[in-house]
Amino acid sequence: MRTQNNLTVEVDCHSLGSNECPSMTSSFSPMDSPTPTPTSIYSQGSLASPGWQDAGSYPGHAYERHTGATPMRSAFRLAGMTSNENMGMSYGAMEAQERMPMPDFLSAYDDNVEHFWLPSDGPKTYETGTHSLPYPHTLPQCPPMVRSNYRPHAAYLPEAATNPCLSRSIFHHAERVPQSMSMGNMMPWIPQATESIAPQTIAPSQVGPVTPPPSYSEFPTSIQTFKTHSPTTPLRSCSIGTASGPDTPISRLSGGAADYLEDFQQSPPFRDGLNRLQRQPSRKMIRKQSSRQNMSLENLPSIIKQVQFKCKEPGCKGRFKRQEHLKRHMKSHSKEKPHVCWVPGCERAFSRSDNLNAHYTKTHSKRGGRNRYVATLDESSPDYDPDFRGQLTPDGLPIRGSTLDDPMPNSREYSVDGLDD
């Protein structure tokens, strides 16, 4: 039968105040814990389990506030561990002679204490997940960057985001380069001669063809400008180092913009695209060239067609498109005037009937004129009758039943020698 003994742990708190270190002297029975563990001595309420909020000296000491002499006088000494020391004592892989028996510390555990062996001078390396006490997670350990002023506790950023040589474009004018991009500020980024950088290589399966930008139709016009422009800025003239591989972006910066453009010109996609542009002009250029050819005098269509009918009368320059027009025009040159005005006393003759009708309308259908008024030719008169042919009164009214052969009434002569308008 196992004898139950009480273990008394005394903690010297002379260096701490009464509020900070309450009485830690109490009786503890190891058999009260169902599963004896090394940390079970903190679960009875007599010895407060140390938390990270109580560790005032973190990261210096992980378990207690070390302000004076060592507070714990017992052999179970846990103070003096740093923040990166291990709390899970890895005793399983140690030799049996290097282990320190647990009954030396806790006399109540007489048997079956194989899993309570603690190393006397075991390595104190921190291993995540080997202890039950909470521990703040730190940032993941990243490979150190090759820099002369590398800070191990700084947050890791990609090289392209922190290196000014890679975060800005190389195609900048000299006046646009800020003062922070001077050669003196870039010296910390340049690796020293003693440091070596592993060549950055890319597998052949990952290397894709170099394709020009979408607007490469405008790119050839500016190639000569880049070639003739001498590098004056540190970004174009400085060499970032020879340890980098031949295909890295850093090697592109060592030669400046001209080398990169020469390599870009030699790429097959660029040559094919340039040749295609030279062989196949755009539709806009084709339309422009065709419009210029059409505007030439030789290709202009004849706006006025060549007339086929000309007046043969000497001195007449009449030109007509139709035969009937020429025939009507030739009557004006002849002496024949078959169309005569029927109004008594007028007797005007015209070579064309349309001219006679115009004479009736303009000369004899108006009152107050020099010519004789005829009521039968006036559309506004109640006696309007364009087919009437006979004698008229002195006022121009028609004499119904008379003919042109009848004598004029009252033997009165009317001057009807009107002039055409």
From Swiss-Prot:
Location(s) in or outside the cell: Nucleus
Highest taxon of the lineage: Eukaryota
Claim: Heme is one of the keywords in the record: no
MF annotations from Gene Ontology: DNA-binding transcription factor activity, RNA polymerase II-specific; RNA polymerase II cis-regulatory region sequence-specific DNA binding; zinc ion binding
The keyword Lipoprotein is assigned to this record: no
Region annotated Disordered, chain positions: 379-421
SUPFAM superfamilies hit by this protein: beta-beta-alpha zinc fingers
Zinc finger (C2H2-type): 309-333, 339-364
Primary location: nucleus
Annotated SMART domains: ZnF_C2H2
Phenotypic effect of disruption: Leads to delayed conidia development.
GO cellular component, one term: transcription regulator complex
InterPro entries: Znf_C2H2_sf, Znf_C2H2_type
GO biological process entries: conidium formation; sporulation resulting in formation of a cellular spore
Keywords: Activator, Conidiation, DNA-binding, Metal-binding, Nucleus, Repeat, Sporulation, Transcription, Transcription regulation, Zinc, Zinc-finger
Induction cue: Expression is controlled by flbA, flbS and fluG.
Function in brief: BrlA, abaA and wetA are pivotal regulators of conidiophore development and conidium maturation. They act individually and together to regulate their own expression and that of numerous other sporulation-specific genes. Binds promoters of target genes at brlA response elements (BREs) containing the conserved sequence 5'-(C/A)(A/G)AGGG(G/A)-3'. Required for conidiophores formation. Controls expression of abaA.
The protein's name in its UniProt record: C2H2 type master regulator of conidiophore development brlA
